Amino acid sequence: MKTSVLFVIFGLALLLCLSFAAELEDTGRQCGEFMWKCGAGKPTCCSGYDCSPTWKWCVLKSPGRR
């Protein structure tokens, strides 16, 4: 039982560290990808994406979109 609790705690700690590292990598980008917050003061969307005027995040370009 104690071993199981330790595995859960270490697993959660590892997950937290990995998500933190991924977040640091994302903030180093010069443009936003899918579901990235965009708008005033934020990086522009990468090529192939547009900033949604409604939701203010990067979405895939579509032929019908202005």
UniProtKB/Swiss-Prot annotation:
Single GO cellular component term: extracellular region
Superkingdom per UniProt: Eukaryota
Propeptide residues according to the Swiss-Prot or TrEMBL record: 22-29
The family this protein is said to belong to: Belongs to the neurotoxin 10 (Hwtx-1) family. 29 (Jztx-13) subfamily.
InterPro entries cross-referenced by the UniProt entry: Huwentoxin-1, Huwentoxin_CS1
Main location: secreted
Tissue distribution: Expressed by the venom gland.
Keyword Signal: yes
Organism (species): Chilobrachys guangxiensis (Chinese earth tiger tarantula)
Keyword Nucleotide-binding: no
Subcellular location(s) per record: Secreted
Function: Probable ion channel inhibitor.
Signal peptide feature range: 1-21
Molecular function GO terms recorded: ion channel inhibitor activity; toxin activity
Domains as described in the record: The presence of a 'disulfide through disulfide knot' structurally defines this protein as a knottin.
Taxonomic lineage of the native organism: Eukaryota, Metazoa, Ecdysozoa, Arthropoda, Chelicerata
Name of the protein described by the UniProt record: U10-theraphotoxin-Cg1a 2
Cysteine disulfide partners in this protein: 31-46, 38-51, 45-58
UniProt KW keywords: Disulfide bond, Ion channel impairing toxin, Knottin, Secreted, Signal, Toxin
Coiled-coil regions, chain positions: none
